Amino acid sequence: MTRSITSRMQITIKTTADDHRIAKLAALAIGLHLIESIVPSPLPGVKPGIANIITLYVLYRFDFATAAWVSLLRIFAGSFLLGHFLSPTFILSLSGGISSLLLLAIAVKLPKRWFGPITLSILAAFAHIAGQLIVVRLWLIPHAGVAYLIPIFATAALVFGIINGVITAKLLADNH
């Protein structure tokens, strides 16, 4: 007798401890992202990026690959849960996330004496904003006037980069 098409098929996916760790950390980052999404922003487009604390923490506690997975899973899952997947909001989040990850991939190799969590948080925040503003300028608002937003967003990146960096440094100090 031949097997029916509708017979049960078992698919087994083997997961590792690293997979479970990434899933837990991504879930934490997604939760922070969702909480942040319900808090009203004083300026449109300006958010503190508290989920990035998790990414930076993971970068220091584990490695770049784990941090990249956590960041990208947060961007994709957060956009699905908030209904933004493939929208301009998603594209902006992804461009900012990729920009900051690219910068962190380089910055993590710099001397830790001068490039600690606060410095990397500030640099990543600036890279995030730069990536987003480039997409805005090239795609959403192809006008030179977008440059007038740079001081506002740069100030926000500096302030929130410092705050998130201090929180990350505190978390790292508490866990060592």
Across the structure, where does each feature detected by a protein language model lie?
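Membrane-embedded alpha-helical hairpins and interfacial helices in multi-pass inner-membrane proteins
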Residues: 85-91, 110-176
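Hydrophobic alpha-helical transmembrane segments
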Residues: 19-24, 53, 57, 68-72, ...
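Structural signal for membrane-spanning alpha-helices in multi-pass inner-membrane proteins
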Residues: 29, 33-36, 59, 78-82, ...
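Interfacial aromatic-anchored transmembrane helix boundaries in multi-pass membrane proteins
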Residues: 33-48, 73-102, 149
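Helix-loop interface residues and adjacent transmembrane-helix termini in multi-pass membrane transporters
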Residues: 38, 61, 111-114
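Generic transmembrane alpha-helix motif of multi-pass integral membrane proteins
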Residues: 50-66, 103-107
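Short helix-perturbing small/polar motifs within transmembrane alpha-helices
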Residues: 10-14, 22-25, 31, 70, ...
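Hydrophobic transmembrane alpha-helices
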Residues: 3-57
